[in-house]
């Protein structure tokens, strides 16, 4: 009888251990998909992935972190709507606001970056010396984006109506290629692709300075926030840790970023001057996002006005 009790107790212990392991495995399998966008020069994301900072933050909480490479803001929003992405770790303010206006339950955890000078309109024809020379010309670039907003703001500043320029919908790589081949007159570009155009003989007609801030944000799913209300805060904490690493290890950071982006040391050092990665949401950021929201409504890209301040995770 005692032997049977021992066997029973042993069996019960094994069963309980298996149950605990099963429960632990189940918790560890909770997915947390955080988009990975390394270009044009997203230093925080590159360091977060390479150094395993997100895994270190969320792994102990029972999350299995993945890094889907979805670079399009619209596609990040679609993935979040489908439930396959919980954090859009680098999404344009334009894309997030369009998605929010369409009813997506998405919130702003903080600012990812500001980089007005990295967004620009590049031209190659020597005859195009000013915005006035763009009349009747073809300019290519993605619509419903910061670059689209930049084009309209640049034209408006010089008193030119948007209808006097032919804006062709085109991705940045295709737009730069079309400019270099001579099939269009101007390309809306940013980051390494703008640099590539300049190295190929193009020049900047104007950039976002004084026109748009190029605000990129960290978007989090409302559903994910309800599951874990400190998700946004933890994302910002990791972002700050990546920035601290970059400050403490500048040479290693440049090396890592160069390996991830294919940029030379000189290119990384030149481009990083254009970015402000401070995640703190300032009053100027809210004002910029409000201007962006008005732009989207005026252009028919958003069906309703959404107050950006209402999307902030407090």
Task: Explain the meaning of each model-derived region.
Residues 32-38, 132-144, 241-243:
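Short loop->beta-strand "edge-of-pocket" segments that line small-molecule binding or catalytic clefts
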Residues 28-33, 55-69, 84-86, 157-169, ...:
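A local structural motif
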Residues 44-48, 68-105, 117-131, 147-148, ...:
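Pocket-flanking alpha-helical
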Residues 123-138, 226-230:
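Flexible hinge/capping segments at coil-to-helix
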Residues 31-50, 282:
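Extracytoplasmic "Venus flytrap"
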């Amino acid at each position: 009888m005692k032997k049977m009790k021992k066997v029973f107790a042993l069996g019960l212990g094994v069963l309980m251990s298996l149950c605990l392991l099963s429960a632990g495995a189940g918790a560890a399998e909770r997915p947390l998909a955080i988009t990975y966008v390394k270009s044009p020069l997203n230093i925080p994301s590159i360091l977060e992935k390479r150094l395993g900072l997100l895994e270190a933050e969320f792994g102990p909480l029972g999350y299995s972190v993945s890094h889907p490479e979805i670079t399009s803001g619209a596609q990040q929003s679609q993935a979040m709507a489908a439930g396959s992405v919980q954090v859009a770790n680098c999404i344009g303010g334009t894309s997030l606001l369009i998605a929010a206006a369409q009813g997506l339950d998405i919130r702003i955890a903080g600012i990812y970056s500001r980089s007005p000078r990295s967004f620009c309109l590049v031209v190659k024809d020597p005859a195009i010396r000013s915005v006035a020379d763009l009349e009747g010309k073809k300019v290519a670039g993605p619509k419903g984006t910061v670059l689209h907003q930049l084009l309209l703001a640049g034209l408006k500043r010089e008193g030119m109506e948007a209808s006097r320029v032919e804006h062709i919908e085109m991705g940045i790589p295709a737009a730069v290629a079309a400019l270099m081949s001579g099939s269009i007159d101007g390309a809306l570009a940013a980051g390494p692709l703008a640099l590539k155009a300049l190295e190929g003989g193009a020049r900047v007609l104007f950039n976002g300075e004084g026109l748009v801030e190029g605000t990129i944000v960290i978007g989090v799913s409302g559903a994910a926030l309800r599951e874990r209300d400190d998700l946004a805060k933890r994302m910002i904490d990791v972002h700050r840790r990546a920035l601290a690493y970059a400050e403490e290890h500048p040479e290693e950071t440049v090396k890592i970023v160069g390996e991830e982006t294919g940029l030379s040391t000189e290119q990384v050092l030149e481009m990083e001057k254009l970015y402000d990665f401070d995640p703190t949401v300032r009053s100027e950021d809210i004002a910029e996002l409000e201007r962006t929201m008005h732009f989207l409504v005026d252009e028919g890209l958003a069906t309703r006005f959404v107050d950006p301040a209402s999307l902030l995770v407090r």
